């Protein structure tokens, strides 16, 4: 008996949980695991092509609107590390512990948490409801540089991945609510709704700071020109876009009435229209099932095993361990598609015997395919605010102006820094129900310029199993600045110095640079040297994980997928979510993931009649 067949027999005969009763009536053309921006549109598109589809979602169908908060009914609470060095991990000022009473406590690594509190790490929320993280994100809709799509085209040798074709895909899915119909590069009849607030009168300190930025870019500084820039379209069609510094408005995935649009809306519309889409909520996928027969000596996926029940995953704050769920199976006539997201997709692959051999053997998981790239190559946009203290009257809150600029550390000549700003300090994420009453709060006059690094060079992050139990959360470490440090941290340091000079040059308002702190005072270029580097090391955060099941070249041992989303070494199994990107697309990957999903829909519809064992 061959190696694959031995592993298949073992997987079919055993389970971490128990052997389920097979229900052959639970058979569909396709099974999609995950309802976020990758899986939700794909499942809907396949159903609209009249294929029967089962869409499995581990969360329920709770909603929250536009609040940007992370209530437990729609959020999984992941806690991650940034470094392998615990000393650097403890430099962060917003770490999380769990007290003996089961409550979160947030503080700096140098603080003293309550006695007996368990250290958790850096808070990293993910959406866990129908719609996935498109239900909890900030809705920023910023198209990636063309080079990110062309990179995939070059890797795969498939020109349909190129920027020109991917822009056509964007035009097809977009339903633009803020531009005149017919505007080049945009769509007006799709399902993916976009909108942008029009700026009104601009008060201080925004006006004075934006005027200083405009002057720095040699742009007009009068209020009318500033207002016009803040209402301009950042996703305009222009071959020079990715090299152009300037000021724009912020498009979001929102409806014409300002409400959040998410993949949930498209799923609901598909079901309401009576297409053959079955949505199963509170359904935690535990492993992929495989046929007893192989395709050309490769395992063939033919179903999913899952637990049905509420709050079964340990990242759910409501998890108690008292509910074991009901073990179920479902089968696919054609294919299984995993869209669980950057953390959970590699976890499910590994639980199914697909991943680094040494990890699987550690937890006695039979190895179907030794795919070393599963769970590796994880990337994120580095983020951090530069905070000022404004003297005098201010108009507070989040404001519209978005800056894209090129630093001397750009790896390819393209813009490498995205900046949003306003009377707030966006220092990252921590549970809103935390119990540390002494946690420092920002007072009146706080102003922040928040960095999001474009084209980050670090690809050393990872997701690893901690157990063969599918309810257990994996180990997650972003390994920040492990590679490409000179480029990534260099751009961050440059932007800090630049922002200090912008604050000093603000028109009609006094703004004192406050954070990162610079005890000795900045030099003539605005830099504080090693102090800035130490602050960046401690306070960098992110919330755009990608690339843990990446598309790659044939022959690359780290490539998990081919250019048609197929898991290498397996038949009938694909991955369609942000984990598939070989490098992080732009500064906010949500719109790119919707586009990826549409691309996958094209591929699957085109291959639906093919013999799965022939290709």
Describe each model-derived feature in a short phrase.
Residues 2-615:
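N-terminal redox-cofactor-binding region of secreted/periplasmic oxidoreductases
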